Swiss-Prot record:
UniProt xrefs under PROSITE patterns: GLPT (PS00942), MFS (PS50850)
Identification of the protein by name: Glucose-6-phosphate exchanger SLC37A4
Disease: Glycogen storage disease 1B: A metabolic disorder characterized by impairment of terminal steps of glycogenolysis and gluconeogenesis. Patients manifest a wide range of clinical symptoms and biochemical abnormalities, including hypoglycemia, severe hepatomegaly due to excessive accumulation of glycogen, kidney enlargement, growth retardation, lactic acidemia, hyperlipidemia, and hyperuricemia. Glycogen storage disease type 1B patients also present a tendency towards infections associated with neutropenia, relapsing aphthous gingivostomatitis, and inflammatory bowel disease. Glycogen storage disease 1C: A metabolic disorder characterized by impairment of terminal steps of glycogenolysis and gluconeogenesis. Patients manifest a wide range of clinical symptoms and biochemical abnormalities, including hypoglycemia, severe hepatomegaly due to excessive accumulation of glycogen, kidney enlargement, growth retardation, lactic acidemia, hyperlipidemia, and hyperuricemia.
Membrane topology category: Multi-pass membrane protein
Amino acid sequence: MAAQGYGYYRTVIFSAMFGGYSLYYFNRKTFSFVMPSLVEEIPLDKDDLGFITSSQSAAYAISKFVSGVLSDQMSARWLFSSGLLLVGLVNIFFAWSSTVPVFAALWFLNGLAQGLGWPPCGKVLRKWFEPSQFGTWWAILSTSMNLAGGLGPILATILAQSYSWRSTLALSGALCVVVSFLCLLLIHNEPADVGLRNLDPMPSEGKKGSLKEESTLQELLLSPYLWVLSTGYLVVFGVKTCCTDWGQFFLIQEKGQSALVGSSYMSALEVGGLVGSIAAGYLSDRAMAKAGLSNYGNPRHGLLLFMMAGMTVSMYLFRVTVTSDSPKLWILVLGAVFGFSSYGPIALFGVIANESAPPNLCGTSHAIVGLMANVGGFLAGLPFSTIAKHYSWSTAFWVAEVICAASTAAFFLLRNIRTKMGRVSKKAE
């Protein structure tokens, strides 16, 4: 009876979060999707467009960090649903606006609301799934972004051409509002909310003094493993962003390839990333099922290191072997391999940061490593392009390659340090 109950609620809750987060991501990109139609009606230059999109990016980075902390303090169900409601309302108001300052202000609010989406998902997944299932379902949930990112441009373009860009934003916003209330009804924070026994993924310390055993924020921040994960995530996300943002320019400007090959490389990278995310979750869950969580080391480390090494090798081959005469298939293979090797670790860092933290601080832990990833994404922008400007794209990619190799080597040396963050009882030690 209990097993059927868990299965039913897991299916309903996961489906609600998958659909809800697909809408989160679609409505994060709606401005980009309808941009061609919008500029036909309202003349905006590149600076205006950049200002509007940058306002959202800055707000999203801040909000995602704050939301991670809030998910440890309040209901994840309410946080997720409230954010989706706000995203929908902002898109509706955006549809009836016409000036750059209003566009930027509303898209900043969109960014703030967007940050409320993912951290509650991680919190709910950890409460409802065993450690040996957590990585797989985390990875599958993350593919909601690939789904929205793949179908979104086509759907938005068809709607904008058939009706208008305003109708597209208003319709997608209204759908968010409706689904936000459905998510509030269907998502439950933990099994106890529906009369089922809570899962306990962490080693039990006994009921007596359990509240005293809760770790503090200071103890979490003093855990060396938190900063090992944060540094690794910064490097992996930064290097991945280098390739996704500048890979096309490198191929076209320095390797003499066509724009079509450049865009095809990006598509291959995203397809490889989709497969890599799911594979990383599934394979690392199998390792977790065999070995289980411990205070030192993590069964997911082996796959994480393998994929980080794959990133380094594929970047080296991309930089050294590609020429103007290279077979197109070889370039696509390199893109797919890099996508597979980079999106896998991105999924794993989030999973490990969540499961290695104390239950009362797992959202905060994920928020911290996620913030460091955003720092990596920032470094992949102007600093990376500055190196390319003063030297060459090849030199810039060589720097990223060396940093990735050094990070992989350092993570290998530190793979068996204490991985349980926060307070550890004397018995566990």
